[in-house]
Amino acid sequence: NGVRSRMCMQPNEEDLCTIYHELGHVYYYLWYKDLPPLFQNGAHDGFHEAIGDTVNLSVTPQYLHGLGLVSAVKPSREAVINQQMKMASEKIAFLPFGKVIDEWRWKVFSGEITPAHYNEAWWKLRTQYQGVAPPVPRTEADFDPGSKYHVPANTPYTRYFLSFIIQFQFQKALCEAAGFKGPLHECSIFGSKAAGERFAAMLKLGQSEPWQDTMEKLTGTRQMDAAAILEYFQPLQAWLAEQSKGQTCGW
């Protein structure tokens, strides 16, 4: 059965990846639609966002070439580093920001951050985790956290942070199911029935089990960890270590 998604889009890579991401949500819905309503949700808040992003991890240059959407990329270290740098700007740069949002919210809820210091505390966290500072002087007359929709909407943000961790765990497990033997960043599970069946076995559980049990069905582990991210970005890590040798990095 086909599904439909209505959106305003342009014929570019960003919108193509958005389609894959949104279809990840849709097929998650379809797999758990026969469960009791109480269980028709992701195993935890991070799962739903991670599903679509896991699919996107398989949209590799080789996969796009197979579809005839891009020309063949001549294998080279430069090409790998360029692609990894692009992915890191999306996947790694987000992580500290994803942590800042809810850490600030939780400290507001606990009273550790008081109304008189909302903005000061916001920028202290931004500087601590992201190494960024306001471009112009800010005071408590400003409310910069409110510029992020999820803050005034009181929408938890940890789901996105967690999704950026577990999507790489999912991808690694699916690549193993598909029998892929190369570097993790080159793996595309498209066309693998074995990977699809392994994925579906987890998706159809919805929220019917503790999330640890659901994760174990796919990954074989009951914990969230960043080992798969480190493996995925190993080429970039090695390159950055070379480029920054003898330098002190940080803020």
Model segments located where?
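Catalytic zinc-binding patch centered on the HExxH motif and its immediate surroundings
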Residues: N1-G2, A153
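Short pre-active-site segment immediately N-terminal to the catalytic Zn-binding motif
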Residues: G2-Y20
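Short, hydrophobic/aliphatic alpha-helical segments
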Residues: R6, K33-D34, P145, G206
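Short coil/turn segments at secondary-structure junctions
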Residues: M7-Q10, F39, A88, N154
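C-terminal, non-catalytic "cap/extension" segments appended to globular domains
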Residues: L16-Y20, Y27-Y28, G46, T54-S58, ...
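Catalytic or ion-translocation cores adjacent to nucleophile or general acid/base/metal-coordination motifs
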Residues: G2-R4, L30-L69
